[in-house]
């Protein structure tokens, strides 16, 4: 019985670590996308100023 509980706990721990790793990867993608949007937004503002429409 104790061995079953230990195995279940180990499995739950492994699943939790896998989920945390996946969430970390998702967060990384979100941060990268936000940075890209900020770069694009900055570029658009610069172009608007250069064209006299901003």
From Swiss-Prot:
GO terms for cellular component: cytoplasm; membrane; neuron projection; perinuclear region of cytoplasm; photoreceptor inner segment; plasma membrane; SNARE complex; synapse. The N-terminus is blocked. Gene3D superfamilies: 1.20.5.110. Its main location: cytoplasm. Keywords: Cell membrane, Cytoplasm, Lipoprotein, Membrane, Synapse, Synaptosome. It comes from the Eukaryota. It is a lipid-anchor. It is found in: Cytoplasm, Perinuclear region; Cell membrane; Synapse, Synaptosome; Photoreceptor inner segment. Transmembrane segments: none annotated. t-SNARE involved in the molecular regulation of neurotransmitter release. May play an important role in the synaptic function of specific neuronal systems. Associates with proteins involved in vesicle docking and membrane fusion. Regulates plasma membrane recycling through its interaction with CENPF. Modulates the gating characteristics of the delayed rectifier voltage-dependent potassium channel KCNB1 in pancreatic beta cells. Belongs to the SNAP-25 family. Part of the SNARE core complex containing SNAP25, VAMP2 and STX1A; this complex binds CPLX1. Found in a complex containing SYT1, SV2B and syntaxin-1. Found in a ternary complex with STX1A and VAMP8. Interacts with HSC70 and with SYT9, forming a complex with DNAJC5. The interaction with SYT9 is inhibited in presence of calcium. Isoform 1 and isoform 2 interact with BLOC1S6. Interacts with CENPF. Interacts with EQTN. Interacts with HGS. Interacts with KCNB1 (via N-terminus); reduces the voltage-dependent potassium channel KCNB1 activity in pancreatic beta cells. Interacts with OTOF. This is Synaptosomal-associated protein 25. It comes from Oryctolagus cuniculus.
């Amino acid at each position: 019985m104790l061995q079953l509980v230990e195995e279940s706990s180990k499995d739950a721990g492994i699943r939790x670590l896998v989920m945390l790793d996946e969430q970390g990867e998702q967060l990384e993608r979100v941060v990268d996308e936000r940075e890209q949007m900020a770069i694009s937004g900055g570029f658009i503002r610069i172009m608007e100023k250069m064209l006299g429409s901003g």
